[in-house]
């Protein structure tokens, strides 16, 4: 007999689905603390991915900057907006061509790390795996280096 544990539905909020297995806590960490109740499914069976992670965040609706951050860690993620227990909108995160102000350059000598009023700007060189290149110093970053430098 197969036993299944399901994450309960949320009344209003955001569901982040199709996160690569083991990445849910990283996604949650970059979203920061909020007042929403959070349900986490880690290494859940998925027909599409084999194993995946899922986040359900009650009473929280994400901004574009949050979606850009998620795209850096989980570019295959699907976002569902839930109102009154119904999905009213569903879409995949979209990796922008350029990333502004949400990642710090790992090059300590970059102008963006000096005491200058310069906002960071990165070009997305690759979507899989995600690779960013600083517009100012051409330093490339990928994987954990991006996660470590998220602002």
Swiss-Prot record:
Q: Cite the PANTHER family for this sequence.
A: ASPARTATE CARBAMOYLTRANSFERASE REGULATORY CHAIN (PTHR35805:SF1)
Q: Name one GO molecular function term.
A: metal ion binding
Complex formation:
Contains catalytic and regulatory chains.
Q: Which UniProt keywords apply?
A: Metal-binding, Pyrimidine biosynthesis, Zinc
Q: Name one GO biological process term.
A: 'de novo' pyrimidine nucleobase biosynthetic process
Which organism is this entry from? Picrophilus torridus (strain ATCC 700027 / DSM 9790 / JCM 10055 / NBRC 100828 / KAW 2/3)
Q: Which cofactor does it need?
A: Zn(2+)
What role does this protein play? Involved in allosteric regulation of aspartate carbamoyltransferase.
| Cofactor binding, per record | Binds 1 zinc ion per subunit.
Any idea which positions bind Zn(2+)? 105, 110, 134, 137
Protein name (database record): Aspartate carbamoyltransferase regulatory chain
Per the UniProt record, one Pfam family is PyrI
Stated family:
Belongs to the PyrI family.
InterPro entries per record: Asp_carbamoyltransf_reg_N, Asp_carbamoylTrfase_reg, Asp_carbamoyltrfase_reg_C, Asp_carbatrfase_reg_C_sf, Asp_carbatrfase_reg_N_sf
Specify whether Transmembrane is a keyword of the entry.
no
Q: Keyword check for Membrane, yes or no.
A: no
List the GO terms this entry assigns under cellular component, sorted alphabetically: aspartate carbamoyltransferase complex
